[in-house]
């Protein structure tokens, strides 16, 4: 299962509204292994500090797509899984 083009476009639109300068898909959707219960894993970079406001973007994407979303910032990536995540990345918005 993949994200449809219109779903990716909705994510990009939400990123723009929430000061996200980079967004990439990783995990089961990026590997085309997602099923009906899979969440959407997104690696993001904010253009300015957000505090806990980053949750607004996650909730907005969840509401729009009807699926749980995990937003992870580049700075919060564990060194133990960083390479695993980076090899799956599908950039949706912005530049690495």
Spans of features found by a protein language model:
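Catalytic core of pol beta-like nucleotidyltransferases
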Residues: 1-24, 30-36, 47-96
């Amino acid at each position: 299962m993949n994200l449809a083009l219109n779903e990716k476009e909705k994510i990009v639109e939400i990123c723009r509204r929430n000061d996200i300068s980079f967004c990439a898909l990783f995990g089961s959707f990026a590997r085309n292994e997602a099923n009906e219960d899979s969440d959407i894993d997104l690696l993001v970079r904010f253009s300015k500090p957000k505090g806990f406001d980053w949750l607004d973007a996650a909730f907005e994407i969840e509401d729009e797509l009807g699926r749980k979303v995990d937003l992870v910032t580049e700075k919060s990536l564990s060194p133990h899984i960083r390479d695993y995540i980076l090899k799956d990345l599908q950039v949706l918005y912005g530049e690495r």
